[in-house]
Each structure stands twice: as structure tokens, then as C-alpha cells.
Swiss-Prot record:
Keywords: Amino-acid biosynthesis, Cytoplasm, Histidine biosynthesis, Lyase. One of its GO terms (biological process) is L-histidine biosynthetic process. This is Imidazoleglycerol-phosphate dehydratase. GO terms for molecular function: imidazoleglycerol-phosphate dehydratase activity. Its EC number is 4.2.1.19. It is found in: Cytoplasm.
Length: 196
């Protein structure tokens, strides 16, 4: 069973293409025009063992908001398309990831019900040129279009770069756990309702 997808999103603000393989090895080609976002997408690919090819052109002459948000939206659409009817998946995933003084926890549920709880007390407003508030916009876009419930908590951290990086690494690892095929589930949908 192939769990690959390609999605394009074209608006007056951005042109986005995401191709992924949920059963990959972490290979990635990233060109969003936002270097820090490329760095974070690399964390998702490597720690989620997802092959990821993302290209984006956006109105970054204004700021990075539309590009970051729309990449999150398109990634969410691609994950939803690749995962299909969710038969046989584990459904839930979680991960704790440290980076020096920072520690983050991410928990995901492929419930079909979009919901985001994002609790990251950033210690500064920017990491280089990247506005840290855009990280919540990325995950909000992802959640709303992947149809997942996502809890993100930075439990401690002093360096804002470390705070964000632990979040993205933990997200990749939680995603990997949730989309794994459970051989004991025998292709059933992981819900007592029989649908997600």
C-alpha cells in the first residue's frame, strides 16, 4: 500500500507544492524561501521518517506569514491524502524531545476533529529573521487541514531556537508513531465508532 501524496496550493499570495511519502526514510528537498522554516521542515522529515519535497513562492517581501501558514495548510492536506481512510494506523502519537535546556512534548490524534493546543512561552520574539509567532500559524494550518487534534507544550527552555526546534522534532516523532501501521489492528479503523 503506497502512502504517498502530492498537493499544490495556489493563491494570490503563495504558490505551494508538497509531495510526501509517509513510509520514507527522511529524505527531503526543501525550498520555501524561508530558511528557518526549511530547517524546521527538515526536522519533521528526519524525525518523522517522512520523505518530504516542499517548494514555495510567496509574498515574503511583505513578511513570511502567508508562506509559513500556507505550507502548514498544504502539508496537512498532503498528510490527510496520503493516510487515506486511516485503516490500520496506530492513530495516537506522542514524543518528548530535549535540546540542551529545552524540553517539549507533542501529542497527536488522527481523530478527524481539528484542534490545536499550543503552549510555548517563547523567550524572545524572533529567531534570526523568523517571527516565532509564525510557528503557531504553521501548526494551525496543518491541524485544520489534516483533521488532527494536536497538543504542543514547551515544558522548559531559555533559547527560543531550542524551544521551536524541540517542538518540530517532537512533532515529527509523534507523527511517525501515529501513522505507523499496527499489524495487530488487521486493517481496521482505530475507533469504536468504526469511522474517523
Amino acid at each position: 500500500m503506497s502512502r504517498r501524496a502530492e498537493v499544490t496550493r495556489n493563491t494570490s499570495e503563495t504558490q505551494i507544492r508538497v509531495a510526501l511519502d509517509l513510509d520514507g526514510t527522511g529524505k527531503q528537498t526543501l525550498n520555501t524561501g524561508v530558511p528557518f522554516l526549511d530547517h524546521m521542515l527538515d526536522q519533521i522529515a528526519r524525525h518523522g521518517m517522512v520523505d518530504l519535497d516542499v517548494s514555495a513562492t510567496g509574498d515574503t517581501h511583505i513578511d513570511d506569514h502567508h508562506t509559513v501558514e500556507d505550507v502548514g495548510i498544504t502539508l496537512g492536506q498532503a498528510v490527510a491524502k496520503a493516510i487515506g481512510d486511516k485503516k490500520g494506523i496506530v492513530r495516537y502519537g506522542h514524543s518528548y524531545v530535549p535540546l540542551d535546556e529545552a524540553l517539549s512534548r507533542v501529542v497527536i490524534d488522527f481523530s478527524g476533529r481539528p484542534g490545536l493546543e499550543f503552549h510555548v512561552p517563547f523567550t524572545r520574539a524572533r529567531v534570526g529573521n523568523f517571527d516565532v509567532d509564525l510557528s503557531i500559524e504553521f501548526f494551525r494550518g496543518f491541524v485544520n487541514h489534516a483533521g488532527v487534534t494536536l497538543h504542543i507544550d514547551n515544558l522548559r527552555g531559555v533559547n527560543a531556537h531550542h524551544q521551536i526546534e524541540t517542538v518540530f522534532k517532537a512533532f515529527g516523532r509523534a507523527l511517525r508513531m501515529a501513522v505507523e501501521i499496527d499489524p495487530r489492528a488487521a486493517g481496521t479503523i482505530p475507533s469504536t465508532k468504526g469511522a474517523l
